[in-house]
Regions:
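Extended alpha-helical rod segments
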Residues: 58-59
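N-terminal mature ectodomain segment of secretory-pathway/periplasmic proteins
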Residues: 65-71
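Extended, charged coiled-coil helical stalks used as long, distance-spanning scaffolds
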Residues: 20-23
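Contiguous, function-dense segments enriched for cysteine-driven chemistry
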Residues: 35, 40
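Small-residue helix/turn framework positions
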Residues: 3-18, 41-54, 73-115, 120-141, ...
Length: 301
């Protein structure tokens, strides 16, 4: 854990703020690094064989932080994450980070009855400007990540999040309300996919669809954090349009297409090309649907 002693040994006044923020952000199991990661020059050098962050376990992780005049310069290197960040501690704080690789392990939710982890022991969540050339969650590959956000009172305003790859682009904006105590996430979303089969394969549904393009527009909300979608509380509405694709035999339902809608729930505005129905699956020319969600229940027009 980071050193929480008063800075009575000549360290800068904001040393405690930096180390407390790191300590509140991470639950560390120290590896070969020093037991006390605080450096005499006011920096922080943490080496961990395991680090738990947002209920995700990172392996072989190192953080080096050096203090500038008004900010901290942070280097991050690990099996899953490589990059650098700049942290300005004034006010709620501001983080600007650039990653060549940001691969988040699959989440391990806390056991029932265990309190939700608090991201910062200051009760404030920093504003963020984050970009990653390669962003991945578990085995799901999302391409390039861009995130802009800022704190507004008890909320965290998501000004822009964008995930882009050759197969498609997802963009959203919204708010993380009451993030510290009673979190709820609300987003305006847009997804444009130029190769539906490749896109679905990247995000964990290989072999569901061949070819195709699609677009989704709408608003969604759920109880919980942005990084922890809760299907039973999911509400909102969106429109779906898809063209020139084919459901493969192994995955005949649109449930695998979006993880939300089944083939049987689609409206009649679907034209089928049956040239490959007996060999590979259903080919479609055009699909259009308006979907409404209420606490996990879904209806289509």
């Amino acid at each position: 854990m980071a050193d929480k002693r008063p800075s009575s040994d000549g360290r800068p006044k904001d040393f405690q703020a930096a180390t407390h923020w790191l300590a509140g952000l991470m639950d560390l199991e120290l590896g070969s690094g020093p037991k006390n990661p605080a450096k005499k020059d006011g920096g922080v050098d943490v080496v961990a064989t395991n680090m738990i962050l947002f209920d995700r376990r990172f392996q072989n992780f190192q953080i080096k932080a050096e203090r500038g005049n008004t900010q901290w310069l942070i280097g991050i290197d690990g099996d899953d994450v490589r990059g650098s960040a700049l942290w300005q501690p004034d006010g709620a704080g501001f983080i600007s980070a650039r990653f060549s690789q940001l691969h988040l392990p699959a989440a391990n939710p806390p056991p029932p009855g265990k309190a939700r982890a608090v991201t910062s022991n200051t009760g404030r969540l920093p504003s963020m400007d984050i970009a990653a050339d390669s962003f991945q969650i578990g085995k799901r590959k999302f391409g390039r990540l861009e995130l802009l956000s800022k704190q507004e009172g008890q909320d965290w305003r998501i000004e822009r999040v964008r995930l882009s790859s050759p197969a498609g682009v997802f963009s959203a904006d919204g708010v993380w309300q009451g993030w510290l105590d009673r979190p709820q996430t609300s987003l305006n979303v847009n997804l444009r996919v130029s190769d539906l089969g490749q896109f679905l394969g990247n995000v964990g549904y290989p072999g569901a669809v061949k070819r195709g393009n699609a677009e989704i527009n709408g608003q969604v909300s759920w109880i919980g954090d942005p990084y922890a979608l809760d299907p039973p509380t999911l509400s909102g509405n969106f429109t779906l349009a898809a063209k020139s694709g084919q459901f493969l035999k192994a995955e005949p339902g649109v449930g695998k297409l979006l993880g939300l809608i089944s083939l049987q729930s689609l409206p009649k505005r679907i034209s089928l090309d049956f040239r490959d129905i007996f060999s590979e699956g259903f080919a479609f020319d055009d699909i259009a649907a308006t979907v409404k969600m209420d606490l996990g229940e879904m209806k289509t027009d």
